[in-house]
Amino acid sequence: MASPMEAVARSSLVLAPRRRRALGLLPAAAAPFVLDCRRRHNGGMRRPHVSFACSAELDTGRRQLPSTGTRAVMSSCPGYVEGRMVGENTSQINMGREARIRRHLENPEFLPSSYDIAWVAMVPLPGTDHLQAPCFPECVEWILQNQHSNGSWGVNEFDSSASKDILLSTLACIIALEKWNVGSEQIRRGLHFIAKNFSIVIDDQIAAPIGFNLTFPAMVNLAIKMGLEFPASEISIDQILHLRDMELKRLSGEESLGKEAYFAYIAEGLEESMVDWSEVMKFQGKNGSLFNSPAATAAALVHRYDDKALGYLYSVVNKFGGEVPTVYPLNIFSQLSMVDTLVNIGISRHFSSDIKRILDKTYILWSQRDEEVMLDLPTCAMAFRLLRMNGYGVSSDDLSHVAEASTFHNSVEGYLDDTKSLLELYKASKVSLSENEPILEKMGCWSGSLLKEKLCSDDIRGTPILGEVEYALKFPFYATLEPLDHKWNIENFDARAYQKIKTKNMPCHVNEDLLALAAEDFSFCQSTYQNEIQHLESWEKENKLDQLEFTRKNLINSYLSAAATISPYELSDARIACAKSIALTLVADDFFDVGSSKEEQENLISLVEKWDQYHKVEFYSENVKAVFFALYSTVNQLGAMASAVQNRDVTKYNVESWLDYLRSLATDAEWQRSKYVPTMEEYMKNSIVTFALGPTILIALYFMGQNLWEDIVKNAEYDELFRLMNTCGRLQNDIQSFERECKDGKLNSVSLLVLDSKDVMSVEEAKEAINESISSCRRELLRLVVREDGVIPKSCKEMFWNLYKTSHVFYSQADGFSSPKEMMGAMNGVIFEPLKTRGN
């Protein structure tokens, strides 16, 4: 069975010849302007680097990155120049978006937190009476200058409606102003806002910040004690205090480190009698803060002086002035989250150098076991996953502090049952590179169980993270197709999303840029894919492959495999080369399986052995002739293009890989005819070649933008990547095609394993053993792919990993090329269905 392959994207092969002629882009005999381009850029009539160099589409606004050999030629072609002019305005907009994203990657910016600013404003100048002077007058000034027109303070970026978060921030700002006896008008308007929206406080259907049922009542009491005329009836205040009492009652039945951490985290909003500040200060970090929270640290200073805490607040105010954020420092978590988002929505390749700088810095902090990385659970988990997937040498032993569920439950995140932290730990556990990583195994076990429990409860129902949890549990990172993954993430991306801590923590407008850039990038990919399919359909007709009665109609599935493996639009040559090669391997597979006699099979192999001397061999039948000429013309065309890109002849290597493939198919056919039962070793040696990775992946690698040395196919690293991927794909195919092949009287690894055991092993046990082998090969494959000290270029190694993921998805339910309904559904989603974003 041939391999399901992805490809690469964006190239000169995108338009079918007839369509190119219709658009005036590439006449059959080459229009004068094409010939002129060739003369200018290639010296007279010498062959250009790529066959259809001037067939670029009109620019739709996104900056195009044509295949390597195409760019110089395209620059003076009329179609290209016109397209560039049409898209100039959009390109400028995109450049602005990218610039803002880069700035945020380098130095994350978040909107000021009114709540935290208010608490920092309450800190008195050391050595003075508490009522004399603020230590940070710039924070007091910020409060005076930044009240909203409705009387509130807080983040209300997208609407002006009240929320518990805004009410909490407004009350904190009122208390800060009252403490320093300033802003009487602002206080009056703030109290009016609270009075108008007071019903929100006791509405349990409205989302609340962490600890709200404790902090808001405590601050109401504080306001009353300060002499403020609180704008609520005695009954309403009693209801608020009842909320606090119910929350305290709920918490009173347990004693744990997690509870202590939680109380310390929200200490600024607790009643004085409830707080032991000496216990709270046990959670002070090396930077002097409590949980990197300006509000909690400021509250500690209000109640007891501490040099380190004061130093922390000075560092915050020195950096931000009066615009204090709700968490600081947050750079690493924010930067890693942004990197993860860029990967998930498919635009990380546009920011590769920025991402490398962030990961280099993160790796240094990881090696130093820096608190900002190691002690924050979601940051630690995300750092491990991203560093490992990008080739940094991080050991799973460094996660020993989160190997057990008890560690999670004893943290603030665990005590709050934070789904995001749990999800990050689960994702990190799946990035295993060997069978001997028990920490990851334990972590994955308990985090996965807790996430499944959440799905069965109402905890996260109706929240955006519900979909993320369902997706992560259903599709491990090695079981997703990049284009489908990108589409799902873009459609579920919320540009208004914020981190809900004690108050909103919202990035400064960058989410809108991310969504716009990703949506346009994906739409451009779709347009490219659609043009490539038209080209492939024309190619199929020109080679009369659609007239072969013995072969399956597999062109769409072949292209889907290629697009799933090589998804960026700028790698079109690689993707089309891959798709054509897959389609041809399936034709050959069907030819040897059901469409030919032994004589015809031998005839086809003889013709390929002669290749350019094929006229010395007679065609045994019309089917042989059709298959050979389709193979001959396509391999030569792709070989000529690849040779131009690589500056040497590479066609011979592709022909050799085809010969190996056809000979292995012939061996398999001979076993079928003679009823020979091979040993497992014989079967695997032959069948991993019939998985067809050789003829499909090598030709695509030549178009990946890397100069590959002549003997790459003889390199040990290439050979091992090839072996591991072929083994995984073959075993995956065998498991899912077992029942069908049994009915056809064919053997595969499942049936051979059962036979070798003399029927002691059941079919299900054999499948389980093979699945274990697949898992082992997958881990070893990933280890080779992410390893930085190899000689194979990273982009080429990643193609093997992407191919594994494609194979896994294709064979997770059934033999991928026998499931047209499922594959067409996926194809429609990636190629034809428009994005359905949240309307941000």
UniProtKB/Swiss-Prot annotation:
Enzyme class: lyase
Pfam family, one: Terpene_synth_C
GO biological process, one term: diterpenoid biosynthetic process
Organelle transit peptide: 1-56
Residues that, per the record, bind Mg(2+) 1: 589, 593
Co-factor(s): Mg(2+)
Sites where the protein binds Mg(2+) 2: 589, 593
Gene3D superfamilies: 1.50.10.160, Farnesyl Diphosphate Synthase (1.10.600.10), Terpene synthase, N-terminal domain (1.50.10.130)
Regulation: induction: Induced by methyl jasmonate (MeJa) and UV irradiation.
Main location per the UniProt record: plastid
Binding site for Mg(2+) 3: 733, 737, 741
Listed InterPro entries: Isoprenoid_synthase_dom_sf (IPR008949), Terpene_cyclase_plant_C1 (IPR044814), Terpene_synth_N (IPR001906), Terpene_synth_N_sf (IPR036965), Terpene_synthase-like (IPR050148), Terpene_synthase_metal-bd (IPR005630), Terpenoid_cyclase/PrenylTrfase (IPR008930)
Cellular component annotations (GO), alphabetically ordered: chloroplast
Cofactor binding note of this UniProt entry: Binds 3 Mg(2+) ions per subunit.
GO MF term set: magnesium ion binding; syn-pimara-7,15-diene synthase activity; terpene synthase activity
EC number in record: 4.2.3.35
Assigned protein family: Belongs to the terpene synthase family.
Remaining remarks: 9-beta-pimara-7,15-diene is a precursor of the phytoalexins momilactones A and B. Phytoalexins are diterpenoid secondary metabolites involved in the defense mechanism of the plant and produced in response to attack (by a pathogen, elicitor or UV irradiation). Momilactone B can also act as an allochemical (an antimicrobial and allelopathic agent), being constitutively produced in the root of the plant and secreted to the rhizosphere where it suppresses the growth of neighboring plants and soil microorganisms.
Function: Involved in the biosynthesis of momilactone A and B phytoalexins. Catalyzes the conversion of syn-copalyl diphosphate to the phytoalexin precursor syn-pimara-7,15-diene.
UniProt xrefs under PANTHER family: 9-BETA-PIMARA-7,15-DIENE SYNTHASE, CHLOROPLASTIC, ENT-COPALYL DIPHOSPHATE SYNTHASE, CHLOROPLASTIC
Name used for this protein in its record: 9-beta-pimara-7,15-diene synthase, chloroplastic
Gene field: KSL4
